[in-house]
Amino acid sequence: MTDLKSPQTDQPTSSFDEVLPAHSAALYREFQAGRVIVRELWDNNRSELVANPLYNLLYNHLSHFRTFYEHLGCLLVFNDEGSFFFLKESSDDEAEEHDENAFRVQVVLLLIGRYFARSGRDLEYLARPDAGLGEQDLVAMGADDEYLEILRAARFEKGLSEALDYLVKRNLMFSSGANRYFLSSAGMHFLEELVREYEQA
């Protein structure tokens, strides 16, 4: 007679056995905070981009996490061009909240892109840690009444600093020093997408 309590050594392992619960929980917290999971993160101590272990975890166990989040009512999306992952909500209430967050992100990215293009610089520099937005840029944008009005319409009452912080908290932008910012691969991808849509309109 078989002992039901003893594990069978020849049984196939579940994909859950391959991922530590602490790692799954860390990923879940990132997504719940509205962040995208980018391939590289900015390390302030080393002043360079470093590999994101959570990105590698998702990439190496993609099938497992797609199924896992599907059971939670979400769609795990991998964007190959921008090298990042994000969650799409499936319920109407959450989709509405997602739309508002997406709108606010788009407003900030469009303002940054518009300002950068007007200053005669190539948008690609926005994704470089040694370039991006500097102190003079922040002062100029913060003094522009039109920009501030647009930001207020998107519910950024405190102006540019609140808007930039909104992107930083979502891994769409990094702060590389005092009054210095640059777009992550995900932030740059979304900006390029917005520019393409604008040019086709």
Label each PLM-derived region with a short phrase.
Residues 83-91, 174-201:
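Accessory beta->alpha helical hairpin/"wing" motif in late/C-terminal subdomains of nucleic-acid enzymes
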Residues 38-53, 126-151:
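Short acidic, hydrophobic short linear motifs in intrinsically disordered regions
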Residues 2-98:
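Eukaryotic partner-binding/assembly regions in large regulatory complexes
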Residues 57-65, 150-169:
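Short amphipathic alpha-helical interaction segments
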Residues 129-134, 156-163, 183, 187:
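Short, conserved alpha-helical segments within structured domains
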Residues 67-72, 77-132, 136:
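Short basic alpha-helical hairpin corresponding to helix-turn-helix/winged-helix-like nucleic-acid-binding
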Residues 149-154, 174-178:
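Short conserved catalytic/interaction loops centered on acidic-Pro-aromatic/His motifs
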Residues 71-78, 164, 168-178:
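A short, conserved structural fragment
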